[in-house]
Amino acid sequence: MPMYQVKPYHGGGAPLRVELPTCMYRLPNVHGRSYGPAPGAGHVQEESNLSLQALESRQDDILKRLYELKAAVDGLSKMIQTPDADLDVTNIIQADEPTTLTTNALDLNSVLGKDYGALKDIVINANPASPPLSLLVLHRLLCEHFRVLSTVHTHSSVKSVPENLLKCFGEQNKKQPRQDYQLGFTLIWKNVPKTQMKFSIQTMCPIEGEGNIARFLFSLFGQKHNAVNATLIDSWVDIAIFQLKEGSSKEKAAVFRSMNSALGKSPWLAGNELTVADVVLWSVLQQIGGCSVTVPANVQRWMRSCENLAPFNTALKLLK
């Protein structure tokens, strides 16, 4: 297709003459053969390169930390989503052996505070319709470690209390003066929805729930556990209260399976030593009575081991 011809802007080999302004620094010719910096622009590019390098270095550090954080979150996510995560944890708690229950009792002043001239008195309100067996077991264990002044009272909100519950602490010998005891343990049978414990109105609020009170009382024995084992024990206590005691038949069956698996690896639920988890779970099993779920073999063996101990055996007699 024919087109009209346009004259060249510059002809021959004559260089192109363009008047450039003097208010800007000169840039290199992108079509030229030389790729060196333009005259007068070196200091600008050097400063620009240093700032870019610093920015890139910061960006690399941030990205590296983000990748590490993502890897850690992915690892935790896989651990949580694993069905047998709780059972796998029991394999790593063998590194730190817990202290035995019979040799290490805490100084009560370090836990309950120092009160000159006054007996440290723990007051528990419990409903006789649902006696907290775990607290009665712990009372017997406390008596083996400390000089305990034990008393039982009946609140006016309760019309009648069975004779065996009124004598749940046995015949108390109070010939010694009050100041000779290390700890006071007062049980009041009262019409309360949940078991309550009061120790010091000035320094602490009441503790509610059989599991929470059992945790507090068991801490007086001075057992020490690593973080993993302590978490496992707390988990068993919560399972006893919220799943085994208050859960459905399916939840109870799941608890028995978990207990059977754990007791197949160790004589007690959290290792080779008796813990508060064993006390609370045994108590709840006795309270729920004839459960429709079949009790596995390892759990039956564990229950016999508990009942062979005097504190458990004494508490068990209260149900008869």
Swiss-Prot record:
It is found in: Cytoplasm, Cytosol; Nucleus. Residues 162-225 are annotated as: Interaction with TP53. Residues 82-162 are annotated as: Interaction with PRKN. InterPro entries: AIMP2 (IPR042360), AIMP2_LysRS-bd (IPR031889), AIMP2_thioredoxin (IPR041503), Glutathione-S-Trfase_C_sf (IPR036282), GST_C (IPR004046). Keywords: Apoptosis, Cytoplasm, Developmental protein, Differentiation, Disease variant, Leukodystrophy, Nucleus, Phosphoprotein, Protein biosynthesis, Ubl conjugation. Phosphorylated on serine residues in response to UV irradiation. GO terms for molecular function: molecular adaptor activity. One of its GO terms (biological process) is apoptotic process. GO terms for cellular component: aminoacyl-tRNA synthetase multienzyme complex; cytosol; membrane; nucleus. Residues 220-317 form the GST C-terminal domain. Coiled coil: none annotated. Pfam families: AIMP2_LysRS_bd, GST_C, Thioredoxin_16. The keyword Protein biosynthesis applies. Accumulates in brains affected by autosomal-recessive juvenile parkinsonism, idiopathic Parkinson disease and diffuse Lewy body disease. Required for assembly and stability of the aminoacyl-tRNA synthase complex. Mediates ubiquitination and degradation of FUBP1, a transcriptional activator of MYC, leading to MYC down-regulation which is required for aveolar type II cell differentiation. Blocks MDM2-mediated ubiquitination and degradation of p53/TP53. Functions as a proapoptotic factor. Part of the multisynthetase complex (MSC), a multisubunit complex that groups tRNA ligases for Arg (RARS1), Asp (DARS1), Gln (QARS1), Ile (IARS1), Leu (LARS1), Lys (KARS1), Met (MARS1) the bifunctional ligase for Glu and Pro (EPRS1) and the auxiliary subunits AIMP1/p43, AIMP2/p38 and EEF1E1/p18. Interacts (via N-terminus) with KARS1. Interacts with EPRS1. Forms a linear complex that contains MARS1, EEF1E1, EPRS1 and AIMP2 that is at the core of the multisubunit complex. Binds FUBP1 (via C-terminus). It is linked to Leukodystrophy, hypomyelinating, 17: An autosomal recessive neurodevelopmental disorder characterized by atrophy of cerebral cortex, spinal cord and cerebellum, thin corpus callosum, abnormal signals in the basal ganglia, and features suggesting hypo- or demyelination observed on brain imaging. Clinical manifestations include lack of development, absent speech, microcephaly, spasticity, seizures, and contractures. This is Aminoacyl tRNA synthase complex-interacting multifunctional protein 2.
